[in-house]
Each structure stands twice: as structure tokens, then as C-alpha cells.
């Protein structure tokens, strides 16, 4: 029977120990609780059976019961309370619980008085939790064990109790905070790892980098606004990519200005509340900073993946600019929808955390699971998909360069474009990979950093100290500075893509109050030059009919060049004006299925001519020019064209046109 009593007495402690799973020192200590003085025993142990890690905390928890004890509602009430809040200390590993009959007598005699004072009977004190017996507390055998410890019994024994939230870091239960897997607790502010001077330096460093990134991305976006038709697919995603990181850098700059006013809760000295990290969505300013920062961080990465997709479509299946642009709605749905969904999920899970280094709010700063699933996993997925598509596109372009003969000019432009893609991708991938590496390092060593912090602050906070600490380490500030630097600098490569002489000319024209009409793009538009595939697949000995681009920067006109057709015409002795009209007329010839060439209708010419040029044509000029063309010159030109070798006239996409630069190209 005695053995059964001991086993049953130890069972609640076993459950309690398995629940808290942490660290501290087990030792007998004198009872300092005023309510538990003058009892048959005078030593207790902490933490007690109600999860109070010191007698000061236990005394605060016992205060509501003082009126009942002072009014002496029951002679069993005070021994019963002390059995739970300050149990008798015996040999290590042995705990005695009060009997159920003792609990029932105390409850029946004091419950009405407790209702009068508005004090509920705690759930931890339910009588059904205690062994079914009827003996006083403590028993005589317990007093003997407490007064005569066994030989060799340890005076102080280490026991694993886990992290106990200090009173200064306690948070209202309604807010749903959590710190080190302890509910209603929050990390301290300022940062738990760094000194104030280190935090001040880090804040100014982040502010400076955010200004640089904001300036670069804003310049890219404004360059796009000056000439919105200049950047078409496949390079249009660079603009949205720049906009995303412009917003990211703006939020970090706002965090620099706010310091820790949003990322941290203010201290309340009257309630012994220290400044703690903001968590959850109750702080509207912190929630807004988190939504913008996380949304545009993820959206920027998705836009980079879309950029690699558009390059892949242009390089491998030879999609043209118009064909890629038809998928723009799908691109926007993915780029804004995926980050939006992740942001909503995090808001619903209440995973927002204040960053007391940068002053912003983000996710995964203290919650390792949120860091893994909502930061590391998406970023790694974006890198894998983007790099795969990028390599496939570069390999395809390189195969074209090696296997198919190109003119030297086109070879140089293709190589230049491949170099630009490679440099831009490296400038994006290297910072992003460094950020991912910092996150992996942080989540791997965070447990050691937290244990070190508890070891250094446990006596100050009066909480259990760590047990059997084998490794102690503090994070280096350079790790966090590198993470913030690379997270911001990843948006700067966009300015190198738009940086060119043409950009300088456009800004100069903008500041002087005039706009150039439209200038032909240079090497970065190589994927959009006319009849690229045709030049790759044609016979090297076959002559090419060059095609006029008009004023378009994308080279989408399908008119035959008047200069080339004039070279074919045998009427070179005609006057300059007649020669020009003949060439213009031949530029509108179309070849029918039987091999003959027929003139286009004027309606077809009107549809092909640029809109600005069409307004200058009058009916008189059109009819007068056609009237001066004699029949001999027309038939002679048609005959000469028929006798020439096969001439390729195609209506290719921006990937399937010849790369030819006119003499007037910018």
C-alpha cells in the first residue's frame, strides 16, 4: 500500500515535468511565504507543482486567497494551499500531494466566501486531481524524511525545466503572443542579442542602404514612365521587379525613421512590464509594414521568375513580343496573387513579428517554423525555377550562335545580349543566395543563441537557468548586417539594365521639355529584332530584302524597304522624285500564290504606315504620285523581281525577323 502511495504521489510530478520540459536547479530552500509560516515544516522547493518558478511568483498567485485565510473559513484551507504553493521538501525525486478529503473540506467550507469576494476556485486545485485518502498534510512519514535525509542524498540536483517566461515579459493572454514555445510571452526590446550602440549602428547602416536602393529602383521606374513603349516583353518584368524592390526599400527607410516605436511595445513600469517585441495583428502600423514588406519581397522574386520565363519563351520556342504580351494577364495574376495569398495566410495565423533591429515588421524573426515555410521555402523554389529556365534559355541562344552562321553584326549583338542576361542574373542571384544562406545559418544556430541568452539573464529575471549547457554562442552583428544589405541591394541590378546612352538622351530630352519620337532599341532588344529566325535559317547566298521600321522602337513594320527595291529597279536614270515614288509603290507589292506580284490597295498601305505619317498624306499627293508611274517602269520592276533568286518576305514575330540596323538607328 505504501509503495502504491509513493508511485501515485510521484505521478503528477512526472506529468508536470514532462509538460514543462526545461531547466533548473532542484534544492531545498527556506519558506518565505507569509501565509505558510508556522507550519510543521519550514523548507520547500521551487518550481512548485503549480508552475511557479520562485516563491515571489507563488506569493503573487496566493494573494487572492488572503481574505479567506484571514477570516479563517476553514482550518484545512491554509495547509491545503501551502501543500500546492510551497510543498514540503524531501529527498530528490519524492513529492507528496494533499489528500482529496482535505481538498473537499477546504472547498465546501470556503467556496461561498470565495464567491462573495469574486475569487473562482482554480482548475489546478480541482479535488479530483488528488489521491483518494484522508490524512493531514504533511504526513508524519513525510516529516521524518524531510528532517532526516538519507545518507548521500544530494543537497542540490540539476533538473531540466525549460524556459520560464519572466514576469517582465508576460503579455495579456488575449493577444496570442508566444516566445520560445511559451504562450503569453514576448522577446525583450531592445534586441536580446546586441547592445544599444550596435543597434544604433545597424539602424543607420540599414537606412543608408535603403536610400541607395530606393534611388536606384525609383530611377528605373521613372525611366520607364518617360517612355512606356520602350520596355516591352520579354524585358517588361524588370520594371515591375524594380517597383517591388522600390517598395521594399521604402518600408526599410520608414522603419529607420520610426526606430523601434512600431516594432516594440512600450514598457509599463507600474505593472513591472518591460518593453517587448510586437507580435500579431493588434498593432495596425506593424501589420501594415509587414503586409507591404512581405508582399513586395515575395512579388519581386516572382517577377524575377517571370522574367526568366519570358526570356525562355523568346529564346527557346522563339515567341515574339506580341505573343508573350498576350500572357501578361497570367503573369500579373501569378506575380501578385501568390504573394497576396501567402500574406493573407500569415495574417490569419497571426505570425507577424516586430524587428527591433531594422524597425520594421516581418515573419520568422523568432518563429523558426514560420521562417522555414513562409520565407525559406518560397525563396528556394523561386531560385530553382528561375535558374532552370535561365540556363535553358542561355544554352539555346548559345547553340544558335555556334551552330547557325550569322552576320558579324548579329553575332556581336547576340553575344552582348547573352552577357547582359548573365550579368543581370548574377547581380540578382548572388545577393539572394547570400540572404538565403543567412536565413539557414540563423535558423540552425538560433537555439544556441537563445540558450546563451537565458544563461546570461536567468538570475536577473529570476527564472530557471539552463541545465548542462555544452555550447554557448552569441550571433555576430555582421551576419544581420549582411542579411539586410543583400535583401536591399538585390533591387539595384534593375538600374544597370536600363542604363544606356538612350536613357541619357531620354532624360536630357525630358529635362529640356521635348521628347524624341521613338528610337530603335540597341542590343538588349535583340530578341525583338525583325526576322531573327529567318536570318538564321536562310541560305547565306540568298539576298535579303530589308524592311523599314518606320518610327517604331521594336521593328514591327512589315513594309519592304524602299531603298532595297529601288536597287532592284532598272529605272535608275529617273528623276529623284519619280525614283522615290517607284520605290514606294514597289514597297507595297505582294506576291500571289502563282508567283506574280500585285500592288497593295491603298487601304493596306494605310494600315501599315505609322499613324503620324498617315496624317500627312493627302489624296492629292497619293494620286499624283501614282499617276507619274508609267506602265513600263512597273512591268520592268516586276520582271526584274521575278528573275531574281527566291526572295524571303515574311511576316515574322519579333523573334523571327532579320537583325538589320538602318543608318538612322539610334
From Swiss-Prot:
Residues 617-638 have a biased composition (Basic and acidic residues). GO terms for molecular function: G protein-coupled receptor activity; PDZ domain binding; Wnt receptor activity; Wnt-protein binding. It is a multi-pass membrane protein. SMART domains: FRI (SM00063), Frizzled (SM01330). It comes from the Eukaryota. Keywords: Cell membrane, Developmental protein, Disulfide bond, G-protein coupled receptor, Glycoprotein, Membrane, Neurogenesis, Receptor, Signal, Transducer, Transmembrane, Transmembrane helix, Ubl conjugation, Wnt signaling pathway. InterPro entries: Frizzled/SFRP (IPR015526), Frizzled/Smoothened_7TM (IPR000539), Frizzled_dom (IPR020067), Frizzled_dom_sf (IPR036790), FZ3_CRD (IPR041769), GPCR_2-like_7TM (IPR017981). GO terms for cellular component: apical plasma membrane; axon; cell surface; cytoplasm; dendrite; filopodium tip; glutamatergic synapse; lateral plasma membrane. Residues 227-237, 310-328, 396-420, 499-666 are cytoplasmic. Residues 538-666 are annotated as: Disordered. Interacts with VANGL2. Receptor for Wnt proteins. Most of frizzled receptors are coupled to the beta-catenin canonical signaling pathway, which leads to the activation of disheveled proteins, inhibition of GSK-3 kinase, nuclear accumulation of beta-catenin and activation of Wnt target genes. A second signaling pathway involving PKC and calcium fluxes has been seen for some family members, but it is not yet clear if it represents a distinct pathway or if it can be integrated in the canonical pathway, as PKC seems to be required for Wnt-mediated inactivation of GSK-3 kinase. Lys-Thr-X-X-X-Trp motif interacts with the PDZ domain of Dvl (Disheveled) family members and is involved in the activation of the Wnt/beta-catenin signaling pathway. This is Frizzled-3. The gene is FZD3.
Amino acid at each position: 500500500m505504501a509503495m502504491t502511495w509513493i508511485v501515485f504521489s510521484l505521478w503528477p510530478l512526472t506529468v508536470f515535468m514532462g509538460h514543462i520540459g526545461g531547466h533548473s536547479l532542484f534544492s531545498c530552500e527556506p519558506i518565505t511565504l507569509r501565509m505558510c509560516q508556522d507550519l510543521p515544516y519550514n523548507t520547500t522547493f521551487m518550481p512548485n507543482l503549480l508552475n511557479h518558478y520562485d516563491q515571489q511568483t507563488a506569493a503573487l498567485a496566493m494573494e487572492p486567497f488572503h481574505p479567506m485565510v484571514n477570516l479563517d473559513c476553514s482550518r484545512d484551507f491554509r495547509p491545503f494551499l501551502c501543500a500546492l504553493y510551497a510543498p514540503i521538501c524531501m529527498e530528490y525525486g519524492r513529492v507528496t500531494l494533499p489528500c482529496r478529503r482535505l481538498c473537499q473540506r477546504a472547498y465546501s467550507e470556503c467556496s461561498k466566501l470565495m464567491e462573495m469576494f469574486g475569487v473562482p476556485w482554480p482548475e489546478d486545485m480541482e479535488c479530483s486531481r488528488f489521491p483518494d485518502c484522508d490524512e493531514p498534510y504533511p504526513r508524519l512519514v513525510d516529516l521524518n524524511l524531510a528532517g532526516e535525509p538519507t545518507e548521500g542524498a544530494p543537497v542540490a540536483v540539476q533538473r531540466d525545466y525549460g524556459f520560464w517566461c519572466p514576469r517582465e515579459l508576460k503579455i495579456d493572454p488575449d493577444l496570442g503572443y508566444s516566445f520560445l514555445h511559451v504562450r503569453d510571452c514576448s522577446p525583450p526590446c531592445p534586441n536580446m542579442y546586441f547592445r544599444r550602440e550596435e543597434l544604433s549602428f545597424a539602424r543607420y547602416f540599414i537606412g543608408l542602404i535603403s536610400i541607395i536602393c530606393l534611388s536606384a529602383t525609383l530611377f528605373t521606374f521613372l525611366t520607364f514612365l518617360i517612355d512606356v513603349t520602350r520596355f516591352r516583353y520579354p524585358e517588361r518584368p524588370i520594371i515591375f521587379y524594380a517597383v517591388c524592390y522600390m517598395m521594399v526599400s521604402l518600408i526599410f527607410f520608414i522603419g529607420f525613421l520610426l526606430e523601434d516605436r512600431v516594432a516594440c511595445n512600450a514598457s509599463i513600469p507600474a505593472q513591472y512590464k518591460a518593453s517587448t517585441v510586437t507580435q500579431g495583428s493588434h498593432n495596425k502600423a506593424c501589420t501594415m509594414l509587414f503586409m507591404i514588406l512581405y508582399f513586395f519581397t515575395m512579388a519581386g522574386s516572382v517577377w524575377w521568375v517571370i522574367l526568366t520565363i519570358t526570356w525562355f519563351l523568346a529564346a527557346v520556342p522563339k515567341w515574339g513580343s506580341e505573343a508573350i504580351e498576350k500572357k501578361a494577364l497570367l503573369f500579373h495574376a501569378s506575380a501578385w496573387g501568390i504573394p497576396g495569398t501567402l500574406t493573407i495566410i500569415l495574417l490569419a495565423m497571426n505570425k507577424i513579428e516586430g524587428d527591433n533591429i531594422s524597425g520594421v515588421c516581418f515573419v520568422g524573426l523568432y518563429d523558426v517554423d514560420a521562417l522555414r515555410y513562409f520565407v525559406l521555402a518560397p525563396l528556394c523554389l523561386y531560385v530553382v525555377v528561375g535558374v532552370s529556365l535561365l540556363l535553358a534559355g542561355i544554352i539555346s541562344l548559345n547553340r544558335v550562335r555556334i551552330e547557325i552562321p550569322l552576320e558579324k553584326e548579329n553575332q556581336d549583338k547576340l553575344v552582348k545580349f547573352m552577357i547582359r542576361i548573365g550579368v543581370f542574373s548574377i547581380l540578382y542571384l548572388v545577393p539572394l543566395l547570400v540572404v538565403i544562406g543567412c536565413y539557414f545559418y540563423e535558423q540552425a544556430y538560433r537555439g544556441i543563441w537563445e540558450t546563451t541568452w537565458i544563461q546570461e539573464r536567468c538570475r536577473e529575471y529570476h527564472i530557471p537557468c539552463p541545465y548542462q549547457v555544452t555550447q554557448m554562442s552569441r550571433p555576430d552583428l555582421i551576419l544581420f548586417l549582411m542579411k539586410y544589405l543583400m535583401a536591399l541591394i538585390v533591387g539595384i541590378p534593375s538600374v544597370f539594365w536600363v542604363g544606356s546612352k538612350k536613357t541619357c538622351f531620354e532624360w536630357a530630352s525630358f529635362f529640356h521639355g521635348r521628347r524624341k519620337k521613338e528610337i530603335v532599341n540597341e542590343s538588349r532588344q535583340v530578341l525583338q529584332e525583325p526576322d531573327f529566325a529567318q536570318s538564321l535559317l536562310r541560305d547565306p547566298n540568298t539576298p535579303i530584302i530589308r524592311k523599314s521600321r518606320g518610327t517604331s522602337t521594336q521593328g514591327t513594320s512589315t513594309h519592304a524597304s524602299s531603298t532595297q527595291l529601288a536597287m532592284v529597279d532598272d529605272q535608275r536614270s529617273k528623276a529623284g522624285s519619280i525614283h522615290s515614288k517607284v520605290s514606294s509603290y514597289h514597297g507595297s507589292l505582294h506576291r500571289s500564290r502563282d508567283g506574280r506580284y500585285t500592288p497593295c490597295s491603298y487601304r493596306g498601305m494605310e494600315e501599315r504606315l505609322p499613324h503620324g505619317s498617315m496624317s500627312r498624306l493627302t489624296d492629292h499627293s497619293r494620286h499624283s504620285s501614282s499617276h507619274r508611274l508609267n506602265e513600263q517602269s512597273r512591268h520592268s520592276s516586276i520582271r526584274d523581281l521575278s528573275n531574281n533568286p527566291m526572295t524571303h518576305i515574311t511576316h515574322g514575330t519579333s523573334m523571327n525577323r532579320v537583325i538589320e540596323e538602318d543608318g538612322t538607328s539610334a
